[in-house]
């Protein structure tokens, strides 16, 4: 797929030279979009996100704020009642709290990349809370104990593919909250 634009490059960044200069040569852009990052006070801040086969890039406009290596992920918590999700990370300063109407696409890409690296499924937790702030490990908590995590221990653990697709091989995703439908085909579902 190198040199080709991903069907999920919603911001058309795969051909942007300034953006590509932040990404290593062996990375493929698989997803780009606007996303809401929740700050320490849980206010939404608009960010651009890039997901490659190796990392997640959080950009403010087009300036790189953080690169999260896929290898740093230890799990993802999602809300059953909102588009919120938390990326639980090891060896980083804190967890990352995001919200996106395209959360299912993001989860699919991240889980496929994680499985390609570790040959195992990424942990997925689903909670009824609309706001997941209680499950975000803060910088202060990590400074006290680097291995500390607020990742749920007694929550409903889901098989990520079952959550994403059930028994379906296709799902329709509303693109840009309009009437334009994007058919998303998934491979190797199990």
Question: In which residue ranges do the predicted regions lie?
Answer:
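A positional/structural detector of protein chain ends, strongest at the extreme C-terminus
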Residues: 1, 187-190
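Intrinsically disordered, low-complexity serine/threonine-rich segments
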Residues: 6, 147-149, 169-171, 178
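Intrinsically disordered, low-complexity regions of eukaryotic proteins
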Residues: 9-11, 35, 136, 164, ...
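Intrinsically disordered, low-complexity proline-rich segments enriched in Ser/Thr
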Residues: 13-16, 21, 47, 54, ...
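Phosphoinositide-binding peripheral membrane targeting modules
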Residues: 34-84, 88-104, 166
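Long eukaryotic intrinsically disordered, low-complexity acidic serine/threonine/proline-rich tail regions
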Residues: 170-188
């Amino acid at each position: 797929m190198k040199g080709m634009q991903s069907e999920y490059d919603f911001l058309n960044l795969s051909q942007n030279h300034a953006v590509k200069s932040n990404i290593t040569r062996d990375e493929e852009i698989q997803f780009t979009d606007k996303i809401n990052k929740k700050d320490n006070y849980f206010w939404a801040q608009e960010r651009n996100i890039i997901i490659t086969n190796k990392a997640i890039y959080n950009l403010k406009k087009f300036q790189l704020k953080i690169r999260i290596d896929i290898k740093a992920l230890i799990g993802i918590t999602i809300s059953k009642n909102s588009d919120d999700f938390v990326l639980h990370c090891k060896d980083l300063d804190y967890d990352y709290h995001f919200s996106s109407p395209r959360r299912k696409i993001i989860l699919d890409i991240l889980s496929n990349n994680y499985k390609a690296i570790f040959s195992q499924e990424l942990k997925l937790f689903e909670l009824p809370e609309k706001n997941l702030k209680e499950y975000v490990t803060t910088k202060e908590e990590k400074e006290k104990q680097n291995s500390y995590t607020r990742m749920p221990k007694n929550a409903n653990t889901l098989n990520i593919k079952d959550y994403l697709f059930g028994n379906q091989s296709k799902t329709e995703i509303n693109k840009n909250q309009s009437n334009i439908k994007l058919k998303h085909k998934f491979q190797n579902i199990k």
